[in-house]
Curated annotation (Swiss-Prot):
The EC number(s) this enzyme carries: 1.14.-.-
Catalytic EC class: oxidoreductase
Record's keyword annotation contains Secreted: no
Annotated family: Belongs to the TrhO family.
Reactions catalysed according to its record: uridine(34) in tRNA + AH2 + O2 = 5-hydroxyuridine(34) in tRNA + A + H2O
GO molecular function: oxidoreductase activity, acting on paired donors, with incorporation or reduction of molecular oxygen
Name this protein carries in UniProt: tRNA uridine(34) hydroxylase
PROSITE patterns recorded: RHODANESE_3 (PS50206)
Highest classification ranks of the organism: Bacteria, Pseudomonadati, Pseudomonadota, Gammaproteobacteria, Enterobacterales
Domain Rhodanese: from-to ranges: 146-240
Role played: Catalyzes oxygen-dependent 5-hydroxyuridine (ho5U) modification at position 34 in tRNAs, the first step in 5-carboxymethoxyuridine (cmo5U) biosynthesis. May be part of an alternate pathway, which is able to bypass cmo5U biogenesis in a subset of tRNAs under aerobic conditions.
Annotated keywords: Oxidoreductase, tRNA processing
Amino acid sequence: MPVLHNRISNDALKAKMLAESEPRTTISFYKYFHIADPKATRDALYQLFTALNVFGRVYLAHEGINAQISVPASNVKTFRAQLYAFDSALDGLRLNIALDDDGKSFWVLRMKVRDRIVADGIDDPHFDASNVGEYLQAAEVNAMLDDPDALFIDMRNHYEYEVGHFENALEIPADTFREQLPKAVEMMQAHKDKKIVMYCTGGIRCEKASAWMKHNGFNKVWHIEGGIIEYARKAREQGLPVRFIGKNFVFDERMGERISDEIIAHCHQCGAPCDSHTNCKNDGCHLLFIQCPVCAEKYKGCCSEICCEESALPPEEQRRRRAGRENGNKIFNKSRGRLNTTLGIPDPTE
């Protein structure tokens, strides 16, 4: 029976990937469609992807598939053909090709079955996720940006919006997509007469969000086809002005794709212009935050002096200190400081 999960250490896999000479292509895609048996589908796709040396992160659920992957350049054509042939619902599926890609985005294949491909918190049995808003292409996006009756809503997390967004786009102040959905409805109640344009990284969140807005009585709803990634690609190909400012945060080793030259964020430690996210090098922290090169050297890649000191301790002492700590999702929020703080480690700005 084939092995349907990875058995090699992360360090060994990363070293193997970095030693590869063949270029890789980072691809993301999603599809909302009914999967009767997600577990069987997962196992079949795992074998297909493994045979083509595909790395990345793939989620499957009864509602569909969501994938961010890295494919050897020589296998991209074969991968596309086999994916399209795997299920009729996937035939002709749009694949978002990364914009700013060094091919080192992933080094292991992780494929999981979940309740939803995007955690939305929706439990309304009458919600129809297929009743989505209209798609917008690149030229239409630019026209909407100039329309005084249009409102752009960013359906990404605060740390994504912080480093890049469309001109005058509205940020929904939340830390997760499930928190954003009810807030978006609440914030837009006074603007039901407006044209609402929703966007996200690759389209998966704004597509569902557009359906949620329509479910809640909003009739003028659009969303950007393929999200920021596809918009920027098509705008460049068509010689259109790219109206997205800054960097597009991505959920892989790169942590961002450069869309425009503007740097609109700041180092969370010293305030210098910077839009480079990193995770605190202290294994007892791993806070996601923005750090400039000067502070990276000063704090040795850590978010605070305490983390810097702790990361320099012998490994056994570090493990002893980590024992019993809360291991939550730690993200620095510029307005509220640290979220789900690791016990005993202060906010880096204090």
